Amino acid sequence: MKFIKALPLLMVAGLSLVGCNKAGDVENIKKTGFLNVGITMYEPMDYFDTDGETVIGFDAELANAFAKTLDAEARFIVIKWDSKVLELNSGKIDVIWNGMTITDELKKNIDLTIPYATNYQCVVTKTANIADYTSADSIKDKKVAVESGSAGEAAAEGVTNLNKVTSQEAALLEVKAGTSDCAIIDVTMANSVVGKGDFTGLSTVSADLIAFEKEDFGVGARKGSDLTDKLNVFFKDSYKSGLLTSLSTKYNVAINDATLK
């Protein structure tokens, strides 16, 4: 499968129709031939292949497949996660498609699709220190790295010493470097990268010891956008066709069977 390379946000700003008719997003995408997809580097959802430029992953494959239904091509744009709603509503991107947790706060500002995947937060620390984490109280006095604006930051409520960084990957690197004691990140990402490559020497604390609530992932579109209904139909069709199940197995991502049937 062909994947388009990611573009910096500023390169795309001049190509986007800022302030376009939200109800006509589908028509605009068909005219331009591009679906602008806001992402961060988040393995296994959206991340660079070995060439350092081509975006692959669970969400990337879905975005490519959805774009084809609009006779368009997915164009992946790396954004700052804590600015995702601003980037969407400014028209610089058409959708946020990056393992995004559905929250009541997001619902106030953007439209969200049906839940297509599930997730929960987890604690990651150095393997040598994992015995220090036996309950939720274990992290209260720790220096905890979180991605700014993420579900991990929300889950860290009550922690007094937060180290807010630009991505979940950066949060893990803070732990690896010893500048934070632990990180709170998506288990979806932890299952894919912890203990491997740059994150060798890190381990995930068992959910039996420190548990967080289940979350649902959805794709974000502008309020009133006609993309939302199209995306919901796409997710249900992809479930029926077996595409979602196949990608779930390939990338070890839990899909939301209950809402997709």
Predicted regions and their residues:
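C-terminal motif of bacterial Sec signal peptides marking the signal peptidase cleavage site
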Residues: 16-19
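A ligand-binding cleft/hinge motif common to bilobed small-molecule-binding domains
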Residues: 100-108, 155, 181-213
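Ligand-binding clefts/hinges and TM-proximal coupling segments of bilobed small-molecule sensing domains
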Residues: 22-24, 151-166, 203-208, 233-261
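Periplasmic-binding protein-like
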Residues: 118-125, 195-236, 254-261
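Short helix-initiation/N-cap motifs at beta->coil->alpha
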Residues: 60, 76-87, 131, 148, ...
